């Protein structure tokens, strides 16, 4: 006997395909990316249902997706809308590859424009103030000084520095090996001041009760997490009398300082672990006007 539920079943229902898409993402994407992609798909499904639009994959047309995008444009920032747009593109790309649809309803749809806004950087004076709060000789001060200098000197992401193991840091060659997005490992260089700070921290780390742990950074109860780094920086900002800084601003500042010192954009892209030049352009724009003014020479004076 066929039940009402069975008769209402639609093979290409977005609700059904969502579970299969989640399996696909779990095999190829990070957990955070998976959550973002599924949230975007769930929001689209909810919109289609609320508007009485088709919820079977083959019935969804461009105008249905555009209706959702238009609504979200009024609700979220351009960067968030762009992220959701790309997430939905990935879903329809997957559905096309799996023969669930004959063509993507997002085919030839243009991604929402994200205005290029300069990312905030930390001035050298403010970083010195931040570092001055770590001038003590105890374990916490030595650890925090090493952490701040390493992030400032290399531009590594918070998650990358949190994932460091003791064996990943080579003081002699002043190199650290970090694992970035997608599990890609790269080597980053640091300077002599950072090497000295790391050495001072490691000497005190040997006496820590969790010293046998592989994790490079240790708190009172064991390895530090990325969220703990944000708390450390926030605490140091208060001590220095500075506005709260986000750990990613150290990455922004590294990019700016590297270009300001004459570094090449292609080299910076490799050092920072960016797979797309789009991020490079955004970071490089942070102080591009300042660099342009500094490099200005008067054509009249050359007459």
Language model features with spans:
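Conserved catalytic core of the tyrosine transesterase superfamily
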Residues: 1-303
């Amino acid at each position: 006997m066929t039940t009402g539920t069975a008769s209402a079943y639609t093979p290409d229902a977005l609700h059904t395909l969502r579970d299969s898409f989640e399996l696909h993402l779990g095999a190829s994407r990070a957990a955070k990316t998976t959550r973002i992609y599924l949230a975007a798909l769930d929001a689209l499904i909810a919109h289609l249902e609320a508007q009485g639009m088709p919820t079977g994959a083959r019935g969804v047309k461009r105008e249905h997706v555009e209706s959702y995008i238009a609504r979200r444009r009024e609700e979220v920032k351009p960067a968030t809308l762009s992220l959701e747009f790309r997430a939905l593109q990935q879903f329809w790309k997957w559905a096309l590859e799996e023969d669930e649809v004959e063509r993507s309803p997002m085919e030839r749809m243009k991604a929402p424009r994200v205005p290029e806004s300069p990312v905030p950087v930390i001035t050298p004076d403010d970083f010195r103030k931040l570092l001055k709060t770590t001038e003590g000789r105890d374990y916490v001060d030595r650890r925090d000084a090493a952490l701040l200098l390493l992030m400032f000197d290399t531009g590594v992401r918070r998650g990358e520095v949190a994932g460091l193991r003791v064996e990943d840091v080579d003081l002699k060659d002043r190199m650290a090996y970090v694992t970035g997005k997608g599990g890609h490992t790269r080597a980053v260089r640091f300077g002599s001041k950072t090497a000295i700070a790391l050495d001072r921290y490691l000497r005190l780390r040997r006496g820590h009760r969790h010293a046998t742990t592989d994790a490079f950074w240790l708190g009172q109860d064991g390895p530090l997490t990325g969220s703990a780094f944000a708390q450390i920086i926030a605490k140091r900002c208060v001590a220095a009398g500075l506005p709260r800084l986000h750990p990613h601003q150290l990455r922004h500042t590294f990019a700016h300082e590297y270009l300001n010192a004459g570094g090449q954009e292609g080299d910076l892209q490799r050092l920072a672990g960016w797979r797309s030049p789009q991020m490079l352009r955004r970071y490089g724009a942070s102080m591009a006007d300042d660099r342009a003014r500094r490099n200005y020479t008067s054509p009249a004076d050359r007459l």
